[in-house]
């Protein structure tokens, strides 16, 4: 069910599926086998094999990383690495020679570095780097990091395994598989990715919390850890499993060098400021370049010596039956054949004269150690055995075989005490062609590079540990320089989860040293002689150490640890891919939601805009129709009134005619002599009266017409105003509805967005829990394998002890019986029968003693097995507890994030509602203002209405004049 939910979370719709993309630096149309010829295999990384390839045209060598990619999404995981390599042209960064995607395989061709990785060099030489060598590496790494950080690139996987060496003594920073390329200068990342032992504290916190992202300062921390690794072969906390080391990094103080006294003050101060747990106060690469530890480095001679030593011709001798006092390391210098001589005392160590190198590089020599026991300055010899320094000048006899190495008590796997390393600084090579002992079996290694293990992946240095043994104070050298130089010799022990020391080792409580108990050494001694030339000086370095079964166990444990780290890195890569896919899906969901919100709002606005347009259009049409109707009514009314007035006027004319007839009739009734005069007078009076009446009548008709027209116009204007008011009211209601709908949509969108973000947060934490559970399952699987290995080793050791005990008892019994018989014979006490009886009693006692020894061994084995079972159960329970704490922390953080998200949403909703009130108020004020403006406009229109008083207005209705009445 959980897996189904996980698939649902990462599922994209059909139209969201990614199509094949063309990448700028990846060629799809060319078979890389047509351009490059595979000449060998360099190693096997976590994501693919690494081959040594040769360009068929130019003959240039390259390291070819071949990765099978099943989909475009997997291909995209490696594009960032290719783009970074293609855009970063720097002398200390590995160069990209080409990238091809052909037949389902991605070929990444990068610069071939014959020197190999620094961790592989340390494995080859069985020692860490000297301080001058570390200075040069640190200087070049800082310059590379300063360049990367300037391009907004975070490497995120700095370690010695990712620092490659060229034959010229320069480094090449490699493996950008988990690097991040930011788009902004201040951008931060929250991906939990990298190798645990080198992770910065802020990166570790991102496993369960994404609230505190990190920036390029994480590389500075990894740089400091890498310097400690180069000094001590292994990074800090290497004895812990990855689960524990993450907890250690997050909660412990910054790591330091195991033996600070053997390193310079500048080196210790550099590590102190680089390993600052607070990334805000941690310096940048540019600031660290000004530090005295690296600021005066001008030569890479130390690295040229290192590469020459690692690439030197090796002669191997295997000798049997060597005793501790016979083991030696000889470091001899031979002057070149030219006229150039050099004192042998100046060329006595693998560093080839560190004092001269420091002078050449303008770097001050670290303060020399006072003449003190070697235990203070040779704190890192072989983890497989004690280290002795012998030299005629030191006055130490080669027969001093009783030196024991005190071992600091800590939880680690049983240390192999069978290896011995000695440095012999007594002579120059008398003959370059001197052959070793003919009795020894010889094997010569070709002068070829180790597998370029970290051209793409860490193939060698991910699972090495530092011995951390010290010599007792009884050995005091005469020269502090030699004591300081020999401190860099070290071998490796396998990294382990932590268990008790081997039962075959006994602890000397007085000296704190370990010694073998109950058995003798019957191991072979491997003697290696390296010859190389640097700057005209031929150097020979001979190292000897005893080969034991623990060597094979160490190699096996290194391999298993590498496998575990590869498995974790594969999980990290898959987690990163899943997180990237989920982030892309979430971004797409938010983008689609915002587009949908915008479309919904635009659709709602458009709907109301259309409604308003329709309303305004209807209003306009209605007003126009009202105007037209008014015009028609006005004409009709005017016509009707004119007709009525015409009839009234005709009647009025008839009345005037009648009056005229009456006047004539009255005049005719007068005497004839008075008629003429009276007629003339009466007619004049009648004419004046007629004109006056006619004028008054016409004026009254005109006034009546104007009143009727004005009344009609007023009624029409009132109707239009009512219509305008009604339309404005409807428009304002639409505006209110529009704003209310938009406000409702805004609130709904706030709620919907909150629900989506909340669901996305749940999906993100579900994915984190899913990835965390997968990681925990892998860790439990690794722990079970480890416990099983420990149980099997214990069973094998017990079987060997059980099989060896009868032989020892028989031999011991014979010896004791012989000694007892001899004592009886010497004493001569008693007769032969008495002696036989005593011998019989002694034999019975021996049988009882041997039986008791067998019972004691059986009890011891049972106790060991019980303790081992308890230890395995304790390991599992402790791991389970740590995993439960992480899961609980993740769930608690999810709860806090969800609660904070809800609170933020409620606060946003409250702020939105608080802002809504003034928006409503502003809307109502705006609508009321428009109403007032409309009323004011109507009022002004009425006041500005013209009042026609001239007869010209009536002439529209009365085309005749008053003179037409006669």
Curated annotation (Swiss-Prot):
Residues 421-430, 834-865, 901-946 have a biased composition (Basic and acidic residues). This is Serine/threonine-protein kinase 10. The modification Phosphoserine is found at residues 13, 20, 191, 437, 449, 453, 484, 513, 548. One of its GO terms (biological process) is regulation of lymphocyte migration. Inhibited by the pyrrole-indolinone inhibitor SU11274 (K00593): intercalates between the ATP-binding Lys-65 and alpha-C glutamate (Glu-81), resulting in a partial disordering of the lysine side chain. Also specifically inhibited by erlotinib. Slightly inhibited by gefitinib. Residues 175-224 are annotated as: Activation segment. The lineage of its organism: Eukaryota, Metazoa, Chordata, Craniata, Vertebrata. Expressed predominantly in lymphoid organs such as spleen, thymus, and bone marrow. It comes from Mus musculus (Mouse). Its EC number is 2.7.11.1. The active site is at residue 157.
């Amino acid at each position: 069910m959980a897996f189904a939910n996980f698939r649902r979370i990462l599922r994209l719709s059909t139209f969201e599926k990614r199509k094949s993309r063309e990448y700028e630096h990846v060629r799809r149309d060319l078979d890389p086998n047509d351009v490059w010829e595979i000449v060998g295999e360099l190693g096997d990384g976590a994501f693919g094999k690494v081959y040594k390839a040769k360009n068929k045209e130019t003959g240039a060598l390259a390291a070819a990383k071949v990765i099978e990619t099943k989909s475009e999404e997997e291909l995209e995981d490696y594009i960032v690495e290719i783009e970074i390599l293609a855009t970063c042209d720097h002398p200390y960064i590995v160069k990209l020679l080409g990238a091809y995607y052909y037949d389902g395989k991605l070929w990444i061709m990068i610069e071939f570095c014959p020197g190999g990785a620094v961790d592989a060099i340390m494995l080859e030489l069985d020692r860490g780097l000297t301080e001058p060598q570390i200075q040069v590496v640190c200087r070049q790494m800082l310059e590379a990091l300063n360049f990367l950080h300037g391009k907004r690139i975070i490497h995120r996987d700095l370690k010695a395994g990712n620092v490659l060496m060229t034959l010229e003594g320069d480094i090449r920073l490699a493996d950008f598989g988990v690097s991040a390329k930011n788009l902004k200068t201040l951008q931060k990342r929250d991906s939990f990715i990298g190798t645990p032992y080198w992770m910065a504290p802020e990166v570790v916190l991102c496993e369960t919390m994404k609230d505190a992202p990190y920036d390029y300062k994480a590389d500075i921390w990894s740089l400091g850890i890498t310097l400690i690794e180069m000094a001590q072969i292994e990074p800090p906390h290497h004895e812990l499993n990855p689960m524990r080391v993450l907890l250690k990094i997050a909660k412990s103080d910054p790591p330091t060098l195991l033996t600070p006294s053997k390193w310079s003050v500048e080196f210790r101060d550099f590590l102190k400021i680089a390993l600052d747990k607070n990334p805000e106060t941690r310096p940048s690469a540019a600031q660290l370049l000004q530090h005295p530890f690296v600021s005066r480095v001008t030569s890479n001679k130390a690295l040229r010596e290192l590469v020459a030593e690692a690439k030197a011709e090796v002669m191997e001798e295997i000798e049997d039956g060597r005793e501790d006092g016979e083991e030696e390391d000889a470091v001899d210098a031979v002057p070149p054949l030219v006229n150039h001589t050099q004192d042998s005392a100046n060329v006595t160590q693998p560093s080839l004269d560190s004092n001269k190198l420091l002078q050449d590089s303008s770097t001050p020599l670290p303060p020399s150690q006072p003449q003190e026991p070697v235990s203070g300055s040779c704190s890192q010899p072989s983890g497989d055995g004690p280290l002795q320094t012998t030299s005629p000048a030191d006055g130490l006899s080669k027969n001093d075989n009783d030196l024991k190495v005190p071992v600091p008590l800590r939880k680690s796997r049983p240390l192999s005490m069978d290896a011995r390393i000695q440095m012999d600084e007594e002579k120059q090579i008398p003959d370059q062609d001197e052959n070793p002992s003919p009795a020894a079996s010889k094997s010569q290694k070709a002068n070829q590079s180790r597998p370029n293990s970290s051209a793409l992946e860490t193939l060698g240095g991910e699972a090495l540990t530092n011995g951390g043994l010290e010599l007792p104070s009884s050995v005091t050298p005469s020269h502090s320089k030699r004591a300081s130089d020999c401190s860099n010799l070290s071998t490796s022990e396998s990294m382990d989860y932590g268990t008790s020391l081997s039962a075959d080792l006994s602890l000397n409580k007085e000296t704190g040293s370990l010694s073998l108990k109950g058995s003798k050494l019957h191991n072979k001694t491997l003697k290696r002689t390296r010859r190389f030339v640097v700057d005209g000086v031929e150097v020979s370095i001979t190292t000897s150490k005893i080969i034991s079964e623990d060597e094979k166990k160490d190699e096996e444990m290194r391999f298993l640890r590498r496998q575990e780290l590869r498995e974790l890195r594969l999980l990290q890569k898959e987690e990163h891919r899943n997180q990237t896919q989920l982030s892309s899906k979430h971004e797409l969901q938010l983008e689609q939601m915002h587009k949908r919100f915008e479309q919904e709002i635009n659709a709602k606005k458009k709907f109301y805009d259309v409604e308003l347009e329709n309303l305004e259009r209807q209003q306009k049409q209605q007003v126009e129709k009202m105007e037209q109707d008014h015009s028609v009514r006005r004409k009709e009314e005017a016509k009707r009134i004119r007709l009525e007035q015409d009839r009234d006027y005709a009647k009025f004319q008839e009345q005037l005619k009648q009056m005229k007839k009456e006047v004539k009739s009255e005049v005719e009734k007068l005497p004839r002599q008075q008629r003429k005069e009276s007629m003339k007078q009466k007619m004049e009076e009648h004419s004046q009266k007629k004109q006056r009446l006619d004028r008054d009548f016409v004026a009254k008709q005109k006034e009546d017409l104007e009143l009727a027209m004005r009344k009609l116009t007023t009624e029409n204007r009132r109707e239009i105003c009512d219509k305008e008011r009604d339309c404005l009211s409807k428009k304002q209601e639409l505006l209110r509805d529009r704003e209310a709908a938009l406000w409702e949509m805004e609130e709904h969108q706030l709620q919907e967005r909150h629900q989506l973000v909340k669901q996305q947060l749940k999906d993100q934490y579900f994915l984190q829990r899913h990835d965390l559970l997968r990681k925990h399952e892998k860790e439990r699987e690794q722990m079970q394998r480890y416990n099983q290995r420990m149980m099997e080793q214990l069973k094998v050791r017990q079987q060997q002890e059980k099989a060896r005990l009868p032989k020892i008892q028989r031999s011991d019994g014979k010896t004791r019986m012989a000694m007892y018989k001899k004592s009886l014979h010497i004493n001569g006490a008693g007769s032969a029968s008495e002696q036989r009886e005593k011998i019989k009693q002694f034999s019975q006692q021996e049988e009882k003693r041997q039986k008791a020894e067998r019972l004691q061994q059986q009890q011891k084995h049972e106790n060991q097995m019980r303790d081992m079972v308890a230890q395995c159960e304790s390991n599992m329970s402790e791991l389970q507890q740590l995993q439960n704490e992480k899961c609980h922390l993740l769930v608690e953080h999810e709860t806090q994030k969800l609660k904070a998200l809800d609170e933020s949403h409620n606060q946003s909703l409250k702020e939105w509602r608080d802002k809504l009130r003034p928006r409503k108020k502003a809307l109502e004020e705006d609508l009321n203002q428009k109403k007032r403006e409309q009323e004011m406009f109507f009022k002004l229109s009425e006041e500005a209405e013209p009042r026609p008083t001239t007869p010209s207005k009536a002439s529209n209705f009365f085309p005749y004049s008053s003179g037409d009445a006669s």
